């Protein structure tokens, strides 16, 4: 895989490469952006059957975990692509809090911010959240593990904020 990534970089030259599905090690220094976890799901953690059969699966919960725990790669090995954030209300089974957490974690630790939503349908609150995400990249932050929770603290526009994520 390392030789394939070397070849790809040689052929592509200075064009931007977004690696998706590539093992992380061979992508170091070869791609500009790289997906760092699974696809975001339309619900929190898939069905019970999916959880029993597959560790690597579409899962918003797993996406958030990968984004937090692979944050050190961002800007060092490549820029992190944590997958899309979703704020929409239709065709989704994430709570408002889960959608906001996904967007904030992507803003804090992602090198790319993508959504597959029709942003033209966002209400004022969703537009404000979307517009605040890029500023999070520069926010001082810390991450610690306490029991079943991962706690992310960061400096928001109106003081210190805390995300408590049960992974």
Q: Can you describe what each PLM-predicted range is?
A:
Residues 35-40, 133-143, 158-163:
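Short, charged low-complexity intrinsically disordered segments located at boundaries
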Residues 102, 106-114, 145-167:
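Carbohydrate-binding surface patches
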């Amino acid at each position: 895989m390392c030789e394939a990534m070397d070849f790809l970089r040689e052929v592509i030259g200075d064009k931007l490469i977004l690696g998706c599905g590539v093992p992380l090690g061979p992508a170091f220094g070869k791609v500009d952006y790289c997906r760092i976890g699974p696809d975001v799901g339309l619900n929190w953690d898939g069905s019970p059957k999916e959880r029993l059969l597959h560790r690597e699966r579409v899962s918003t919960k797993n996406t958030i975990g990968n984004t937090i725990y692979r944050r050190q790669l961002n800007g060092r090995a490549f820029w992190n692509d944590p997958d899309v954030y979703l704020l929409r209300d239709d065709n989704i089974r994430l709570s408002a809090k889960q959608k906001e957490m996904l967007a904030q974690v992507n803003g804090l630790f992602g090198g790319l911010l993508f959504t597959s939503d029709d942003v033209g349908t966002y209400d004022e609150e969703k537009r404000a959240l979307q517009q605040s995400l890029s500023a999070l990249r520069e926010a001082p932050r810390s991450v610690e593990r306490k029991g079943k929770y991962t706690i992310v603290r960061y400096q928001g526009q109106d003081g210190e904020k805390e995300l408590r994520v049960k992974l």
